[in-house]
Amino acid sequence: MHKYNAYRKAASTIAKYPEKITSGKEAKKLDGVGEKIAKKIDEILATGKLEKLEKIRADDTNVAINLMTRVTGIGPAAARKLVDDGITTIEELRKHQDKLNHHQKIGLKHFEDFEKRIPRPEMEKLETFIKAQVEDLDPDYIATICGSYRRGAASSGDIDILLTHPEYTSADEKQPELLLSVVKQLEKSSLVTDTISLGESKFMGVCQLPAEEEDEEDHLFRRIDIRLIPKDQYFCGTLYFTGSDMFNKDMRAKAIEAGFTLNEYTIRPMGSTGIAGEPLPVNSEKDVFDVIGMAYKKPSERNM
């Protein structure tokens, strides 16, 4: 507080001085201007800026940019533009929603809820509810919640679902109606509340677990993604989207050592020319482990 008052007093004195200040030495003659402030005046006169102030401003800018990127849908470039436009807080952002696209508006609308992790008991309820709805629609569907939840995590950031149907394989034309039907079913059941985007094979949106009689308050709004994958690629997909990232990298490296190439779609043998062959049939995650000669690990054993 003492330093703040010292700067305030010096600024007031300089502002009232009738002549243009040309040096720190000249400024020191004024009441309240000491050696440190005089040096800063010399720096401003010589360079047009003050390094310490520039660092503070840069730090403030970075803090504001990091805050903006916490809003779902706002990336670093969009965040910097907002901050350059003078928007540095969530409150200010709410007053300037004309600068946001559809995705970003939904991210802002549910900002506080999306900041909170989803406890495992809630994830388990969501899984039970979603699977029941999908089975009611068509029992041939297969739906798996992947990510850290499948690895046994105590909490999750969002709900990431892989969906498939035996009538859909990679040899077929895309079948967006398979995804659309599930999304409509989840909307009808009041689980899905907002659509961020809906394409041929991926839905991004918002969901809220419907309240039950014993619930004291409504559940929070959560981010949900659903990916539709051909049945013949499903188990490579669940393996990949279950993770962890480090486990996936380790498994891909072991596949290469064994003469195969593995990604989120297929596992294929590598020929002597370095060109990958036809995808191998995969009917379970264990099939992939077996092909590359790796001991099977349950999802809960894949945290690295």
Question: Which sequence ranges carry the predicted segments?
Answer:
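Accessory alpha-helical DNA-binding modules that contact the DNA backbone or grooves
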Residues: 4-159, 163-203, 235, 249, ...
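Intrinsically disordered, low-complexity domain-flanking/linker segments in eukaryotic proteins
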Residues: 170-175, 210-217
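Phosphate/ribose-recognition catalytic cores of enzymes acting on nucleotide-derived substrates
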Residues: 221
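Short, conserved, surface-exposed binding loops centered on an aromatic residue
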Residues: 152-153, 216-218
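Extended, alpha-helix-rich binding/interface surfaces that flank or overlap catalytic cores
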Residues: 1
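Non-catalytic peripheral regions of nucleotide-handling enzymes
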Residues: 206-207, 211-215, 226-304
